[in-house]
Every structure is written in structure tokens, then in C-alpha cells.
Amino acid sequence: MFKLTEKGEKIQEMFDTIAPRYDFLNRLLSFGIDRKWRRFAVKQIRYAEGGRILDVATGTGDVALEIAAQTPASISIVGVDFSKEMVELGKEKVNCSPFAARISMQVAPCEAIPFADGSFDSVTIAFGIRNVVDRAQGLKEMHRILKADGRAVILEFSTPRLTLFKALYHFYFLKVLPVIGGLFSQFSAYKYLPDSVMEFPSQEEFKAIMAGVGFKNLKHFDLTGGIATVYVGEK
């Protein structure tokens, strides 16, 4: 059985704690743009009739639900997350949706995905790879569970390149966001968010990590001036 590191356990505990306010704060702090980003990311997936899609770090199921909305009824979706509280909330959302029969969710970390090799047509992870302590291992697992020519789609925060926009972004992300997040939830969690984004690799560096575990045909898309990035790779 995979054991989280001490850092991983702290991150897991943090997400368990903020789970009840997670969706609300996502909408508030991103001004609702996160929904647009997820829609764009899901448009990049690949699947065959009757295929399966895996959403890693599924949280409360936003991406899993978006996948269901964009794909035929023959497609089944599995969501996994290392936070039990997030998964429980996600199950409630899914059960209240029109897609309950197509989506299943379970607790599992990215570094030890509990499915056989070559099980899925595509794998997605949105705003989650940044929180995986052993990113290379997480990416290896995502690569492993893909079918041949399967596609990985990764949505993650990034740092804008334009100087003025970057300055405004840093002010909001480092000064404003933790305060607003702290008013409604846990301050330390929303202090962790910008810190983790600042230390995340650049787009080219991250694509090199993906290539290192076997992904090919790599590309990325900058969204909203580079605030977020979608990475696409194939097995």
C-alpha cells in the first residue's frame, strides 16, 4: 500500500479541512474563470466509443462532471482523489447530477493509481499535479494506466509572462487571495496555494518532466494571459 510522505499527509489534511468551502472559493477567487479553463481542458481529451476517462485529483468532481457533459453516454468516468472529504462531497454532487450512472469516485493518491496498465483512453488532472509530492511518480502512474496513444490533459496554474500583468497577478495571488480565502476558510491553505504555484516548474520544464516519464507529442496552451496552462501529452 502506498504511504504518503509527511508533506503529503499535511497537504491531504489541508484539503480535507477546506473541502466544505472549496467549490465556493474556487468560483469567488477565480471570478468564475476556472469553469472556462476546465471546459477548454476537457475539450483536449481523446476517447473511443465505450471508452473510459480517469480524472485524478478529482476533488469535488468538477472535471468529472464536465467530461460527462462533453462526451457521449457510452463514456464512463472515474474520479480519484487522496482527500476522503473531497471525494464524499464529490459523490454528493455526482448523485445530484444527470450523470450519476456514468461517474464513480474513490479515494486514491496520484502516485498509486489503483487500476491496471492500459485501462483508460484519457487521464485528466486539474490544479492537482502541483500538490503531488512526487510529481514524476504521479506522472508515471498517469502514463501507465493509459492505453496506447491515450492522452493526458493537465490543467495547472502558471505565472504570466507580461511584466505588468505578472505584477498585478502576483499582488492578487500573494496578498489578496490568502486574506479572502482566510475569511471563508483556512488562511494557511490559501497561503499555500500561491506559494506552491510560485515554485512550480515553467511550462518547458514541466513538459521535460512529462517527456522523461514517456509522454510524447507534448504541447501546452496558455490561458487568460498565462494565469493557467493546459498541458497535453500522449502515450
Swiss-Prot record:
A Gene Ontology biological process term: menaquinone biosynthetic process
Enzyme Commission identifier(s): 2.1.1.163, 2.1.1.201
One Pfam short name: Ubie_methyltran
MF terms in GO: 2-methoxy-6-polyprenyl-1,4-benzoquinol methyltransferase activity; demethylmenaquinone methyltransferase activity
Binding site for S-adenosyl-L-methionine: 60, 81
Pathway: Quinol/quinone metabolism; menaquinone biosynthesis; menaquinol from 1,4-dihydroxy-2-naphthoate: step 2/2; Cofactor biosynthesis; ubiquinone biosynthesis
Coiled-coil intervals, chain numbering: none
Gene3D superfamilies for the chain: Vaccinia Virus protein VP39
Reaction catalysis annotation: a 2-demethylmenaquinol + S-adenosyl-L-methionine = a menaquinol + S-adenosyl-L-homocysteine + H(+); a 2-methoxy-6-(all-trans-polyprenyl)benzene-1,4-diol + S-adenosyl-L-methionine = a 5-methoxy-2-methyl-3-(all-trans-polyprenyl)benzene-1,4-diol + S-adenosyl-L-homocysteine + H(+)
Keywords, alphabetical: Menaquinone biosynthesis, Methyltransferase, S-adenosyl-L-methionine, Transferase, Ubiquinone biosynthesis
InterPro entries: SAM-dependent_MTases_sf (IPR029063), UbiE/COQ5_MeTrFase (IPR004033), UbiE/COQ5_MeTrFase_CS (IPR023576)
Keyword Methyltransferase found: yes
Family of this protein: Belongs to the class I-like SAM-binding methyltransferase superfamily. MenG/UbiE family.
Function field: Methyltransferase required for the conversion of demethylmenaquinol (DMKH2) to menaquinol (MKH2) and the conversion of 2-polyprenyl-6-methoxy-1,4-benzoquinol (DDMQH2) to 2-polyprenyl-3-methyl-6-methoxy-1,4-benzoquinol (DMQH2).
Name of protein: Ubiquinone/menaquinone biosynthesis C-methyltransferase UbiE
Taxonomic lineage from the root: Bacteria, Pseudomonadati, Thermodesulfobacteriota, Desulfuromonadia, Geobacterales
